[in-house]
Amino acid sequence: MELSLSTSSASPAVLRRQASPLLHKQQVLGVSFASALKPGGGALRFPSRRPLPRPITCSASPSTAEPASEVKKKQLDRRDNVRNIAIVAHVDHGKTTLVDSMLRQAKVFRDNQVMQERIMDSNDLERERGITILSKNTSITYKNTKVNIIDTPGHSDFGGEVERVLNMVDGVLLVVDSVEGPMPQTRFVLKKALEFGHAVVVVVNKIDRPSARPEFVVNSTFELFIELNATDEQCDFQAIYASGIKGKAGLSPDDLAEDLGPLFEAIIRCVPGPNIEKDGALQMLATNIEYDEHKGRIAIGRLHAGVLRKGMDVRVCTSEDSCRFARVSELFVYEKFYRVPTDSVEAGDICAVCGIDNIQIGETIADKVHGKPLPTIKVEEPTVKMSFSVNTSPFSGREGKYVTSRNLRDRLNRELERNLAMKVEDGETADTFIVSGRGTLHITILIENMRREGYEFMVGPPKVINKRVNDKLLEPYEIATVEVPEAHMGPVVELLGKRRGQMFDMQGVGSEGTTFLRYKIPTRGLLGLRNAILTASRGTAILNTVFDSYGPWAGDISTRDLGSLVAFEDGTSTSYALASAQERGQMFVGSGVDVYKGQIVGIHQRPGDLGLNICKKKAATNIRSNKDVTVILDTPLTYSLDDCIEYIEEDELVEVTPSSIRMCKNQKMAKKGRQ
């Protein structure tokens, strides 16, 4: 038996899906529509698998495309009662302090509520170091308009956070210091914002500094826009002059209002509302992931189209071919400083979604039937790598809670779920892993977090990730900006010259006698540079860097001139042994400290390593030929985790435990011979 279906056209008609339940994806009963059409049109004949009890009538008609005006209208729908902005800046230009003032003036807190400084830096590590590491969401309401604010990291090593955040917003507040002007990270974040086509409001912060030069800063920022190929509309940016700590802003540096009103007005006026498809199929890109012990993984992102409701069944897509189904158990929006439960979220708003197991950054939460994935987030490649391995020192297992390679592997894989800019690969042995990141600070923050969580492990020295293109070896280069007093400029210039740095700009700043030096330098030359540059400038220089590009191999670079003092045997250090050892260099350990053979206990005052016995005791006899001499020991050097990672060389390791940080020689390399 055959099923007949009449058509009004000799050419294959495009079947509407709603025409009949038998029609699906240009097929009828599983047979291709085009292949069943006989030449000359008329009837379609499909073989039936079994006799039909009664005739079935199907209709087919050509689909008509939507008018161009309707498509255009969909694209131009804007939501005027919402603004999504990110605050971006170079490190220490005052953006987190500015957010504090914005939250206070928007009445986010009670008048009698006591709040700490830098409210958005809630992480312990952020508060200790005075930097923003993770992006944070909050919102304020100004004149019936909800303003979603995202505070972003200012350090170039956490650029991956900035790149993710820019997917959620429609505009940025570019905060620039009134003295320093645009810095390396300013260039990086502005470049990304312009690539997204975002509107930019420039905030010249710290305008109350005595040496402020607002006109120079605005002109320099405009030149930066031109260099980054900004459009005419983007170059016509609004400049706001502000003092974040005082909570004042204005359109002129000489005429500041008593509050941040001019800044809020500029946000509403210059940043457009989100571009949405309110009636379209649901689409939301998971831009950030948080974890809650009770709710599990929480996906954060902006709703691009449709309406998301609590209890809704959705499709979670990684790509066109990889999708799974889930149900939204809880839904939150950001109001003031908190997450607030809600039953539904409209397109254009930023929300947090619970109930989707194993949701990953870059996945799309879409409509169950018509959903399609959004473009995934692209993040720049890592430039530095370090080896992580199980602790093999004689003191292993004494202080840590998680010490096995399985513990280490699971923790590193868990980090990859949130940290898009990081990569983890297997090393040469089963208990070694290679972790790649955007810089040494990027990886050091991970090490510090793991240490505080109870992990015990060893890390090797940072190494740059080179590329080979057309049989040419390329290495990463960075732009380094050094702020140094003129009196110490000579040693700093000499040091950067030894590190293969090439100066391309030098500027003097006002009456403070400070000089800005700009260099293009290999990333290898920056390893261990921070301590060296502080020593050369007597603690007065400020170094900032940002990745520039890959370039030709610059040749050999010597990063450390002095060797190490290495413990000769296991034991406990004594004052008697340290008194003679300190004549050989500066010590890392004091009296009464347990040490092991191969541990680095000091800095040798000459090139090459020197083995010392700092555990020997004074022989006791019954004869007193002379009186006892009082031993005076120098104060040992205290090295932080960052300092230790900068100090070690190819054949050395840092032992990291929850309560101690030690350096030692790599015994595996010692057996092979120093390479």
Swiss-Prot record:
Gene3D superfamilies, per database record: 3.30.70.240, bipa protein, Elongation Factor G (Translational Gtpase), domain 3, P-loop containing nucleotide triphosphate hydrolases, Translation factors
Q: Where is the composition biased (Low complexity)?
A: 59-68
One Pfam match, given by its short name, reads GTP_EFTU
Listed GO MF terms: GTP binding; GTPase activity; translation elongation factor activity
Residue ranges annotated as transmembrane are: none
* Name of the protein this chain belongs to: Putative elongation factor TypA-like SVR3, chloroplastic
Record's GO cellular component, any one? Answer: chloroplast
- What PANTHER family has UniProt attached to this entry? TR-TYPE G DOMAIN-CONTAINING PROTEIN, TRANSLATION ELONGATION FACTOR-RELATED
| Annotated stretches, region: Disordered | 43-76
UniProt keyword list: Chloroplast, Elongation factor, Plastid, Protein biosynthesis, Stress response, Transit peptide
Function comment: Putative chloroplastic elongation factor involved in response to chilling stress. Required for proper chloroplast rRNA processing and/or translation at low temperature. Involved in plastid protein homeostasis.
Its gene name is SVR3
Superkingdom of this protein's organism: Eukaryota
The family annotation for this protein states: Belongs to the TRAFAC class translation factor GTPase superfamily. Classic translation factor GTPase family. BipA subfamily.
Location comes to: Plastid, Chloroplast
The transit peptide region is found at 1-58
Q: What happens when the gene is disrupted?
A: Reduced plant growth, pale-green leaves with reduced levels of chlorophyll. Chilling-sensitive phenotype.
